[in-house]
């Protein structure tokens, strides 16, 4: 059995990691680490685990990391890198769910997140977008799990970028996310009365995920590009729906476009291409799937891509487990074949 330690286990992503790992036939959770809930049983903080998991949250201790084969760091950016360094020095497989190890360009990271204490480790890390960077993930020491918005956007755009089917500076990404994307920490802006029956844009022209999306899209396209990204907050708990627009470099009809996407993602279980309808949040909620729908606007020669994910699963915990499966040479689907709840 693979022994897994989760650092930052009491947040939304940490709890989702625990829930999913309990279903994994090859994993034993060896420790759950949370300074805010230290010495408290998870049965008390999260009663849904009663009779299922009898573990107590612990404060960080290097001995807990030593016991593990894989370490998941579900901590905020800037904080996470300290724990990643400890696990890396111990030779553990490290999967970091913050932004600290997603970038290759230190300048991009520093502009949005500040100084990086261990920039040399960026060369030891891979970007954990499994369907695109699988080979790099296999050989890296650290996996930087992608952000939720970037996962939806990049996978929606990848076939267009790799095949140079769109003008590089024509991309507009309009994304809507559930409130869980903001994390568990109390914030008035995300309280019930502020969010319920409301819908708003935020981080307009300055959201930090823009640089992450641009770096990876530039890599796929083969040259630097700029794009527009605007996130919005939906009055729902979870899920991301991205509507992506770009101008074609040549005319394509919808059937041709669908075939390009189906061929590009031919061997990817977690990518579902819609042919006769469009994705909706309820079809991906609770799953590790990415649902992609396509339309062609002939009068403007633009492609419209709809890309849907569950922000806590494919956008975080599920993709982290998919990365773990890759690192340990397991079938990527292991523990992640889940039908969405729908209602």
UniProtKB/Swiss-Prot annotation:
GO molecular function: N-acetyl-gamma-glutamyl-phosphate reductase activity; NAD binding; NADP+ binding
InterPro entries membership: AGPR_AS, AGPR_type-1, NAD(P)-bd_dom_sf, NAGSA_dehydrogenase, Semialdehyde_DH_NAD-bd
One GO biological process term: L-arginine biosynthetic process
Reaction equation(s) it catalyzes: N-acetyl-L-glutamate 5-semialdehyde + phosphate + NADP(+) = N-acetyl-L-glutamyl 5-phosphate + NADPH + H(+)
Coiled-coil region: none
CDD domains: AGPR_1_C, AGPR_1_N
Organism: Caldicellulosiruptor saccharolyticus (strain ATCC 43494 / DSM 8903 / Tp8T 6331)
GO (cellular component) term, any one: cytoplasm
Function: Catalyzes the NADPH-dependent reduction of N-acetyl-5-glutamyl phosphate to yield N-acetyl-L-glutamate 5-semialdehyde.
Amino-acid biosynthesis in keyword set: yes
Protein name: N-acetyl-gamma-glutamyl-phosphate reductase
Cross-referenced Pfam families: Semialdhyde_dh, Semialdhyde_dhC_1
UniProt enzyme class: oxidoreductase
SUPFAM superfamilies: Glyceraldehyde-3-phosphate dehydrogenase-like, C-terminal domain, NAD(P)-binding Rossmann-fold domains
PANTHER family associated with the record: N-ACETYL-GAMMA-GLUTAMYL-PHOSPHATE REDUCTASE, CHLOROPLASTIC-RELATED, N-ACETYL-GAMMA-GLUTAMYL-PHOSPHATE REDUCTASE, CHLOROPLASTIC-RELATED-RELATED
Active site, UniProt feature: 148
Cell compartment(s), UniProt: Cytoplasm
Pathway participation: Amino-acid biosynthesis; L-arginine biosynthesis; N(2)-acetyl-L-ornithine from L-glutamate: step 3/4
């Amino acid at each position: 059995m693979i022994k897994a330690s989760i650092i930052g286990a009491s947040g939304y992503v940490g709890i989702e990691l625990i829930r999913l790992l309990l279903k994994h036939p090859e994993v034993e959770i060896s420790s759950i680490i949370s300074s805010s809930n230290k010495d408290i049983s998870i049965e008390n903080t999260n009663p849904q685990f009663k009779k299922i998991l009898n573990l107590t949250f612990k404060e960080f201790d290097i001995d807990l990391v030593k016991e593990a084969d894989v370490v998941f760091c579900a901590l905020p950016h800037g904080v996470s890198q300290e724990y990643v360094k400890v696990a890396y020095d111990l030779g553990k497989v490290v999967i970091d769910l913050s932004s600290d190890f997603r970038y290759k360009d230190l300048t991009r990271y520093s502009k949005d997140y500040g100084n990086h204490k261990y920039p040399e480790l960026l060369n030891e890390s891979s970007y954990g977008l499994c369907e695109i960077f699988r080979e790099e993930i296999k050989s890296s020491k650290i996996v930087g799990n992608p952000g939720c918005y970037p996962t939806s956007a990049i996978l929606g755009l990848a076939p267009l970028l790799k095949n140079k089917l769109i003008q590089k500076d024509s991309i507009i990404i309009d994304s809507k996310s559930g409130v869980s994307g903001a994390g568990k920490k109390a914030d008035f802006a995300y309280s019930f009365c502020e969010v319920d029956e409301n819908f708003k844009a935020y981080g307009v022209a300055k959201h930090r995920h823009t640089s992450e999306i641009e770096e990876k899209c530039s890599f796929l396209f083969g040259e630097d590009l700029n794009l527009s990204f605007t996130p919005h907050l939906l009055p729902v708990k979870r899920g991301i729906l991205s509507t992506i627009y770009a101008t074609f470099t040549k005319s394509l009809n919808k059937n041709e476009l669908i075939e390009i996407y189906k061929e590009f993602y031919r061997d990817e279980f977690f990518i579902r291409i819609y042919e006769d309808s469009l994705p909706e949040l309820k079809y991906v909620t609770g799953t590790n799937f990415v649902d992609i729908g396509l339309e062609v606007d002939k009068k403007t020669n633009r492609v419209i891509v709809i890309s849907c994910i569950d922000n806590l699963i494919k956008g975080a915990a599920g993709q982290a487990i998919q990365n773990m499966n890759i690192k340990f040479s397991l079938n990527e689907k292991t523990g992640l074949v889940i039908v969405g709840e729908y209602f």
